[in-house]
UniProtKB/Swiss-Prot annotation:
GO terms for cellular component: cytosol. Transmembrane segments: none annotated. Gene3D superfamilies: VC0467-like, VC0467-like domains. This is UPF0301 protein PMI0339. PANTHER family: UNCHARACTERIZED PROTEIN YQGE, UPF0301 PROTEIN YQGE. InterPro entries: AlgH-like. Belongs to the UPF0301 (AlgH) family.
Length: 187
């Protein structure tokens, strides 16, 4: 089972406050474990603009028509001081990995310097921190009914309102997440 480019959808019974009602986009999954970004937990009072100001990134070619008031997500509890940018594919950044035909992840400062300019990727999601699982941990959590999984779509990452992402991700597999039994078992 390889969950790269999949969503992990928290089951209603998942009570961990870090992951309750969360949707995690899996950026890496291999024999050593998994890494992903929560895409529906905005950090209160932190926008892309405030992050750029704090990092003293001021682009000379800033386009005032491009809003930087989008919220920054809490990608997870690991390395919360590090930024991770999901975006539509654009080449030329110094530290990028193509996850799918529609999504890349970049961790280098050069992508931040394009935000708010005509050079920025068409669609972006900025997060601080990430989520990780040790070898076999995610698979165990799935078997314990903590997560549903479904192949990711860029529409949910980039276009769906944040408050609707949990529900909409579950709809991809035909489930109304609000009516699912929290005590699902194994056949």
């Amino acid at each position: 089972m390889n969950l790269l480019n999949h969503f992990l959808i928290a089951m209603p019974s998942l009570s961990d406050p870090l992951f309750q009602r969360s949707v995690v986009y899996v950026c890496e999954h291999n024999e050593n474990g998994a890494m992903g970004l929560v895409i529906n937990k905005p950090i209160e009072d932190i926008s892309i603009e405030s992050v750029l100001e704090q990092l003293e990134i001021f682009s000379a070619d800033r386009d005032s028509a491009i809003s930087l008031q989008k919220p920054v997500m809490s990608g997870g509890p690991v390395a919360e001081e590090h930024g991770f940018i999901l975006h539509t594919p654009v080449s030329g950044f110094s530290s990028s990995i193509k996850i799918s035909d529609s999504t890349m992840i970049t961790t280098s400062k050069d992508v931040l310097e394009t935000l708010g300019t005509a050079r920025q990727p068409e669609k972006t999601l900025v997060s601080l921190g990430y989520s990780s699982w040790e070898k076999g941990q995610l698979e165990r959590e799935i078997l314990e009914n903590s997560w549903l999984t479904v192949e990711a779509t860029p529409q949910i990452i980039f276009d769906t309102p944040i408050a609707e992402r949990w529900h909409k991700a579950a709809e991809l597999i035909g489930i109304d997440i609000h009516t699912i039994s929290p005590t699902a078992g194994h056949a």
